[in-house]
């Protein structure tokens, strides 16, 4: 193992060397990833997030993996943008069960001018509760990123999904360059980036390596890198894809950890299909973030109590973050709710 692998943050990875990491013996790869992980993180701490779908279904994008796409008949019930108060109530629940970050996702190509004021109120309200805030709203322009940053948004999620070469086989309604441009706007506005991809869409090893290279060779690494395993949903074009080999998925996590040593690598969608042994291997490979709770946008996620039971058996604890004192925290929640009740924007955006 080279010293540079454990000590240096790089932005010049080449395909051949990344493929060589993937092709190592499994135990060697995990040892290397765990060594890198321990150099930058407490190996027995995992960051815990909760994800809420604030607007579900009827998305105009044609992402072949997604049950929210309006192009496919998946039986998913379309829902309007959630009211701000309801979002804050869900955020309070997430806080109560141990989440430190609250992520809000909307099935949009991009947020409209009509919806942005409501979105900004959600950010401000959740932030006031002492939670980190994250949103995924689709493509953003420069003004929207500035507005979100000013409202206090900590993270913006915008996945690259796969390699540039394979991307056109999965999505045709948005270009890869548009995704990269959104990430650039987010970074320029001073927010942190959450960006990763999906395994199990029919991609090759070159594509998996290519995705990680795109992320690792950005001017700054994403602070959070979600690695998703395809959740096959009837009605989507990828519903019959072959399952991802569990060891291949663990390899993806390990290589992500080596390439982006200071990033949180998130064990994301597909965790419901993983047994406890596979999840334990994922943490050994350097995954140190999970989504917590019963739903991951529109697909099932392991129940929160099961997560805590597994953490206890593995000696893992949720990653701590700076908190307000209980009294101040409760006051912040109450104040946020009062402000929302008195705001003219405290209504369903779809009726505006």
UniProtKB/Swiss-Prot annotation:
PROSITE patterns: RADICAL_SAM
Domain of life the protein comes from: Bacteria
Listed Gene3D superfamilies: Aldolase class I
Pathway noted in the entry: Cofactor biosynthesis; biotin biosynthesis; biotin from 7,8-diaminononanoate: step 2/2
Catalytic reaction list: (4R,5S)-dethiobiotin + (sulfur carrier)-SH + 2 reduced [2Fe-2S]-[ferredoxin] + 2 S-adenosyl-L-methionine = (sulfur carrier)-H + biotin + 2 5'-deoxyadenosine + 2 L-methionine + 2 oxidized [2Fe-2S]-[ferredoxin]
Domain Radical SAM core per the UniProt entry, residue ranges: 44-262
Function recorded in the entry: Catalyzes the conversion of dethiobiotin (DTB) to biotin by the insertion of a sulfur atom into dethiobiotin via a radical-based mechanism.
Protein name as it appears in the record: Biotin synthase
The organism of origin for this protein: Pseudomonas putida (strain ATCC 47054 / DSM 6125 / CFBP 8728 / NCIMB 11950 / KT2440)
């Amino acid at each position: 193992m080279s010293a540079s692998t454990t000590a240096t943050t790089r932005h010049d990875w080449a395909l051949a060397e990344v493929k060589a990491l993937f092709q190592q013996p499994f135990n060697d790869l995990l040892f290397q990833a765990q060594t890198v992980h321990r150099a930058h993180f407490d190996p027995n701490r995992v960051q815990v997030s909760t994800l809420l779908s604030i607007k579900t279904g009827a998305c105009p994008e044609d992402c072949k993996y997604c049950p929210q796409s309006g192009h496919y008949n998946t039986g998913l019930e379309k829902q309007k943008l959630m009211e701000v108060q309801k979002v804050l109530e869900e955020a309070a629940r997430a806080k109560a069960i141990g989440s430190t970050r609250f992520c809000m996702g909307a099935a949009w190509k991009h947020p409209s001018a009509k919806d942005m004021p409501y979105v900004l109120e959600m950010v401000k309200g959740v932030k006031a509760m002492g939670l980190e805030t994250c949103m995924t709203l689709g493509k953003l322009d420069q003004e929207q990123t500035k507005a979100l940053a000013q409202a206090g948004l900590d993270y913006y999620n915008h996945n690259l999904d796969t390699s540039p070469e394979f991307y056109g086989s999965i999505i045709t309604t948005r270009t890869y360059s548009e995704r990269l441009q959104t990430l650039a706007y987010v970074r320029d506005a001073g927010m942190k980036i959450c960006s990763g991809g999906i395994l199990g869409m029919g991609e090759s090893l070159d594509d998996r390596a290519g995705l990680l290279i795109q992320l690792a060779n950005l001017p700054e690494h994403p602070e959070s890198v979600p690695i998703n395993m395809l959740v096959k949903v009837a009605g989507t074009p990828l519903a019959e894809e072959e399952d991802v080999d569990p060891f291949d998925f663990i390899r993806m996590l390990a290589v992500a950890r080596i390439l982006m040593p200071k990033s949180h690598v998130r064990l994301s969608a597909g965790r419901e299909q993983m047994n406890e042994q596979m999840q334990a291997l994922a943490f050994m490979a350097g995954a140190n973030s999970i989504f917590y709770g019963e739903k991951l946008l529109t697909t099932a996620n392991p129940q929160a109590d099961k997560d805590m039971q597994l953490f206890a058996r593995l000696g893992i604890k949720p990653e701590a973050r700076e908190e307000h004192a209980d009294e101040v925290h409760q006051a912040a929640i109450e104040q946020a709710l009062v402000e929302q009740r008195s705001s003219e924007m405290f209504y369903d955006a779809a009726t505006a």
